[in-house]
């Protein structure tokens, strides 16, 4: 039904009908101390022209800085064609394509997306997306627990180098499902998971192992050894990966002796703008043998009664709209529009283009680290190789440095000390393909000035 606001006369008549003098009388039972004072100063309504002027005034307060922040959300170049196509009326819809005969275009695009994700991850089947990277990993953990019929403990090992927000999301979702989450410590010299701590669980009943590649610090984990450990210990292995890195690094399906069991991650780098944190989408892929425990939509290819190729939702008996409480997941939709953009993005770039993006990210970050570590009081925090972000250690308070950089128009990075107290005064920095040599030089010059002034 349309939204029709009440007229002043409507409001007056309704208040008279219930014996109230004004709107505030409706809230008298709520103590004043619990009422939000800000609602008392809401300005009167304005017309469209005044609203546009106010929006322009507010927009002028924004500052367009040079961004060197990564930590799970990355600034990549998005070809103009991506959202020009994704915004077409044929794609720009919230409709879930249950009616296959009327949705062949959308279904084929989702099918192509699944194929691309499988090619990137080295797996056999993908779903049509999850809400974001964090919930995709949480769903992957739940899926791993369902898959491991031999385990009686529901104990899940998660590398401490997995994104802290992802680990918090997992804790939130599994805490009431009789699943014990154990965080593995990391080597504070290398910046990767301490394999000695992992080996302590050899022979024990461990349900699943979660590995990040690259990890939160940007470092490259010893994924072959960790995956092989999981296989020999009859533990389901879960890989949480950055899709951009897969254009250069070994796909999770080839890790160790047999590859991982489940792959998931954040799809934002594939054509979605940073957009203040969302919306994004998560991806999840696995082995065909595990498909019936996979959450979310799956699109399949089939033939119609005339023998023509067609596409439809398949294996729907796993899902909430059919199985209700017995479904593999409470997720009953997908991030279709973001997946549409990701499919167009990957199609436009192709394998060679994705490889060029990943290579440029890798080179830019190494050039950035080389420039920054030449400054007195700045050093690389970890020894392990890194992909397109890295942690630097400062001899000055990190919040002071970040504020000074911000004043100079530079978003200088992410301070992880709130999650890792042992990493005080460190800064996680990232340089994707959009950062130029001039951007890197400006960052280095500005940081050098800040460090020298504070030191003096």
Swiss-Prot record:
Record's keyword annotation contains Cytoplasm: no
SUPFAM superfamilies tied to this protein: PLP-dependent transferases (SSF53383)
Keywords: Oxidoreductase
GO MF annotation, one: glycine dehydrogenase (decarboxylating) activity
Catalytic reaction annotation: N(6)-[(R)-lipoyl]-L-lysyl-[glycine-cleavage complex H protein] + glycine + H(+) = N(6)-[(R)-S(8)-aminomethyldihydrolipoyl]-L-lysyl-[glycine-cleavage complex H protein] + CO2
Key word Oxidoreductase present: yes
Enzyme Commission numbers on file: 1.4.4.2
Leader sequence residues: none
Biological process (GO), any one: glycine decarboxylation via glycine cleavage system
UniProt record similarity statement: Belongs to the GcvP family. N-terminal subunit subfamily.
NCBIfam families: PRK00451.1 (NF001696)
Subunit description: The glycine cleavage system is composed of four proteins: P, T, L and H. In this organism, the P 'protein' is a heterodimer of two subunits.
Function: The glycine cleavage system catalyzes the degradation of glycine. The P protein binds the alpha-amino group of glycine through its pyridoxal phosphate cofactor; CO(2) is released and the remaining methylamine moiety is then transferred to the lipoamide cofactor of the H protein.
Protein name per UniProt: Probable glycine dehydrogenase (decarboxylating) subunit 1
Species the sequence originates in: Legionella pneumophila (strain Corby)
Lineage of origin: Bacteria, Pseudomonadati, Pseudomonadota, Gammaproteobacteria, Legionellales
Underlying gene: gcvPA
